[in-house]
Amino acid sequence: DIPIVNSILDDYYFNTRFSLNPLYWLYKLTYKKLIRKVLAHKGSAIYISDKIRDKYNDDMGLDGETIYLNSTVKRKLFAPVNTDNPSITYFGNIGMGRNHSLNDIGYALGRINPKYILEVYSGSKNPLEYGVFKDNPNVYYGGTIPYEQVQEKMQNSDVTVIVEGFLPKDIDESRYSLSTKAADVLASGVTILTYGS
């Protein structure tokens, strides 16, 4: 009887979508049953936000706490944004409509100055997610890079971007989420551009 500490960072348990596919509902039912079984064991839970904590604690009878993200990124000294050739970066998940928001930012940058490039780094292996950038001359998709390199590139950026999707399904899926890169961006002292609903 070793206690379990569950890390709950998203709303997958409660989040359902409309589907006529019986396999979706079979999966969802099996998933929920497994989660209830795991959460019935002695232990606790940690959450990424107070909203998701309250939802799970109330529904499951848990006594979990919100954890607050910290970062090991070194803070850079304040410097004005280099308007001639700014380093503009995004690090993280490009699913849930974030890719389309990043693409919007890329096109907006191109209208400001065709030389401005948004560098996007993500572990996405889904061509439907990163493929939206292929016709955008102001977005460079760099794929996966090690976390140490994320920290280094972030610290050397003029602007780092945090985005969310705008479609109702994207908003619904991320309503209890918090960008895990937010702590790094805030700690870095880099200028932050946020774009979301």
What kind of region is each of these model predictions?
Residues 50-53, 122-128, 197:
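Short, polar loop motifs at secondary-structure junctions
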Residues 7-11, 68-71, 164-165:
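Histidine-centered beta-alpha loop that forms part of the nucleotide-sugar donor binding/catalytic region
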Residues 12, 25-45:
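Membrane-proximal helix-turn-helix segments that form the acceptor-binding/catalytic region
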Residues 40-41, 46-47, 52-72:
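Helix-loop-beta element that forms the nucleotide-linked donor phosphate-binding surface
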Residues 97-100, 148-152, 160-186, 192-197:
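Nucleotide-sugar-dependent
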Residues 71-132, 140-150:
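Conserved catalytic-core segment of nucleotide-activated headgroup transferases in glycan assembly
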Residues 3, 44, 117, 158, ...:
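Proline-centered loop/turn at the N-terminus of a beta-strand
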Residues 2-16:
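Active-site proximal beta-strand in glycosyltransferases
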